[in-house]
């Protein structure tokens, strides 16, 4: 056998090695069946479990905001909200957007708790320290020390005389 035939034989054996043997020694090799789960199947299972909890719909909710510790917000616009009071369970379904807390201002201020308000104050302090252009303060610009108005007034008086 030449080297090309050996290389082809090795590739063929490696391809066969990937297959899963089902059954005994004499049975042919078969590919393992992979079942792909879809979001619709998960949604059906979730809805059936919610029916077991006897959930009730809560109408009239326009938006739901879930605030994370890192300052991001999961925002649901016109969600379907269901609750089960005996099970202490709430279900929020709908399309969700991940947004920064600064994008949601000022409408989200009345929804913030004390922890989120302190986080927001820290963010505001960081922004003011950086300045409007996002860079630190310029160190090249000297600070004003004296009163320049008095010198200009003296010049105008000298010009009048």
Swiss-Prot record:
GO annotation terms (biological process): embryo development ending in birth or egg hatching; negative regulation of apoptotic process; negative regulation of protein localization to endoplasmic reticulum; regulation of cellular response to heat
Major location (coarse): nucleus
Biased composition (Basic and acidic residues): 150-161
Domain NAC-A/B: 40-105
Taxonomy, superkingdom: Eukaryota
Compartment list: Nucleus; Cytoplasm; Mitochondrion
Keyword terms, alphabetized: Cytoplasm, Mitochondrion, Nucleus, Transcription, Transcription regulation
Phenotype upon loss of function: RNAi-mediated knockdown mostly results in embryonic lethality, but embryos that do hatch produce larvae with a large number of apoptotic cell corpses, which are first present at the comma stage of development. Surviving animals are uncoordinated. RNAi-mediated knockdown results in increased neuronal and intestinal cell death and a reduced number of male tail rays in larvae. RNAi-mediated knockdown in larvae results in increased survival and mobility in response to a constant temperature of 36 degrees Celsius, when compared to wild-type.
CDD domains: NAC_BTF3 (cd22055)
UniProt region (Disordered), positions on chain: 16-41, 128-161
Pfam families: NAC (PF01849)
Record field: compositional bias (Basic residues): 27-36
Annotated GO CC locations: cytoplasm; cytosol; mitochondrion; nascent polypeptide-associated complex; nucleus
Function: May be a general transcription factor that can form a stable complex with RNA polymerase II. May prevent inappropriate targeting of non-secretory polypeptides to the endoplasmic reticulum (ER). In response to heat stress, plays a role in modulating the unfolded protein response by negatively regulating the accumulation of proteins such as the chaperone protein hsp-4 in the endoplasmic reticulum. Required to suppress apoptosis in neuronal and intestinal cells to promote development.
Complex formation: May be part of the nascent polypeptide-associated complex (NAC), which is a heterodimer of icd-2 and icd-1 (via NAC-A/B domains).
Family, per entry: Belongs to the NAC-beta family.
Record's protein name: Transcription factor BTF3 homolog
Native source species: Caenorhabditis elegans
Gene giving rise to this polypeptide: icd-1
């Amino acid at each position: 056998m030449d080297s090309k035939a050996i290389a082809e034989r090795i590739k063929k054996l490696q391809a066969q090695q990937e297959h899963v043997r089902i059954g005994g020694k004499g049975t042919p090799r078969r590919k393992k069946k992979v079942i792909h789960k879809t979001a619709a199947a998960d949604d059906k299972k979730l809805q059936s479990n919610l029916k077991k909890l006897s959930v009730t719909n809560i109408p009239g909710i326009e938006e739901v905001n879930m605030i994370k510790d890192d300052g991001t917000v999961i925002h649901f616009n016109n969600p379907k909200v269901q609750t089960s009071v005996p099970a202490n369970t709430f279900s929020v379904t709908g399309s969700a957007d991940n947004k920064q807390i600064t994008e949601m201002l000022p409408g989200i201020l009345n929804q913030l708790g004390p922890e989120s308000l302190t986080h927001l104050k820290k963010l505001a302090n960081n922004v003011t320290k950086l300045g409007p252009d996002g860079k630190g303060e310029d160190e090249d610009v000297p600070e004003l020390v004296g009163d320049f108005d008095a010198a200009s007034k003296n010049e105008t008086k000298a010009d009048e005389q």
